[in-house]
Amino acid sequence: MGRKWANIVAKKTAKDGATSKIYAKFGVEIYVAAKQGEPDPELNTALKFVIDRAKQAQVPKHVIDKAIDKAKGNTDETFVEGRYEGFGPNGSMIIVDTLTSNVNRTAANVRTAYGKNGGNMGASGSVSYLFDKKGVIVFAGDDADSVFEQLLEADVDVDDVEAEEGTITVYTAPTDLHKGIQALRDNGVEEFQVTELEMIPQSEVVLEGDDLETFEKLIDALESDDDVQKVYHNVADF
């Protein structure tokens, strides 16, 4: 599973990097975190978390600095979080998280992306109850038992620790993600491949042929929207 999360980050970076969409999305997220608290990551845990994730996605330093500088200025642009749930082909389910300065625009765009690409937008809660929110931490290593003990000693609420092909994946309660990251740092972990809050599907579906092609187009349409920050789904090996 650890390789899965690392591959997702790598794939998104490769796909979005050419158009700088990923930079723009992190720029908004950094701006919001800095605006809501101190613009100093050493004094603002939420900001530090977003910056760390941006670095994992290879966002350049000048993009990060520009977003923080914007938050320090007189700009008073307001962004609102949103969530849109829906369905794709053959039992696939999708959750779309947004961060936008224009809710009406975003809702219309997401609905259009669903409708024009083989999906259907559902009501709030129609999909999310079949997902579990968890913290996900991925880093190089192979001793899952030792990591599990370290986290328990630090009083971190750990759901699971997996080791696969030189990569360790830690699943925490969502409220303990930051605590888990700090505990691992205290125990010598210097670099993380993934540190994210994720919506984990309780079960997955396998898509093939036309269904898989339709699903890929749907996900691409959703992720290409500037206001969409994260897209979660229940399709295996995608």
UniProtKB/Swiss-Prot annotation:
Positions in coiled-coil regions: none
Annotated Pfam families: TACO1_YebC_N, Transcrip_reg
InterPro entries recorded: Integrase-like_N, TACO1_YebC-like_2nd/3rd_dom, TACO1_YebC_N, Transcrip_reg_TACO1-like, Transcrip_reg_TACO1-like_dom3, Transcrip_reg_TACO1_YeeN, YebC-like
Signal peptide (from-to): none
A molecular function (GO) term: DNA binding
Keyword Methyltransferase: no
Cell compartment(s), UniProt: Cytoplasm
Single GO cellular component term: cytosol
Gene Ontology BP terms: regulation of DNA-templated transcription
Keywords, in A-Z order: Cytoplasm, DNA-binding, Transcription, Transcription regulation
Family, as annotated: Belongs to the TACO1 family. YeeN subfamily.
Name the UniProt record assigns to this protein: Probable transcriptional regulatory protein MGAS10750_Spy0264
UniProt organism field: Streptococcus pyogenes serotype M4 (strain MGAS10750)
